[in-house]
Amino acid sequence: MTLRLAEHRDLEAVVAIYNSTIASRMVTADTEPVTPEDRMEWFSGHTESRPLYVAEDENGNVAAWISFETFYGRPAYNKTAEVSIYIDEACRGKGVGSYLLQEALRIAPNLGIRSLMAFIFGHNKPSLKLFEKHGFAEWGLFPGIAEMDGKRYDLKILGRELS
């Protein structure tokens, strides 16, 4: 696996990986697939201090991605970021998530980040386990906040102090 900053040419692969998680109702609150055009503003909104990275497999294909995003958009929160990790279906369960989260924890202090947060559905046990394994703790809970297919789901906020 090779990690590098995302480039415009990666947008379709990033969106395809994102869309592959929608049907499970475990990862994102989007309920229908999105297009690269739908995600262009989000993609372009990544900056030097809040970047988007892609992980390439040995064949140079985008296998996963990590996004650092501004939390809440107020100056007092500038040292806090939300981290998101998305992994291609073929690469799940193979340690890619651990690799990406370790890289995120390594990179974040260089971006001026002191606190990392992740928003994870309460029923997404694999993601909760991954983040907890890497020192994240539950910082908050929004009970029943998401409704998909007539069912309500909790959203957990996990966080970790880096310094």
From Swiss-Prot:
According to the UniProt record, what class of enzyme is this?
transferase
Which residue ranges does the record assign to the N-acetyltransferase domain?
1-158
Q: Per its UniProt record, what Gene3D superfamilies does this chain match?
A: 3.40.630.30
Reaction equation(s) it catalyzes: phosphinothricin + acetyl-CoA = N-acetylphosphinothricin + CoA + H(+)
Family of the protein in this entry: Belongs to the acetyltransferase family. PAT/BAR subfamily.
Q: What does this protein do?
A: This enzyme is an effector of phosphinothricin tripeptide (PTT or bialaphos) resistance. Inactivates PTT by transfer of an acetyl group.
User: What is the protein's name according to its record?
Assistant: Putative phosphinothricin acetyltransferase YwnH
Query: Which source organism?
Result: Bacillus subtilis (strain 168)
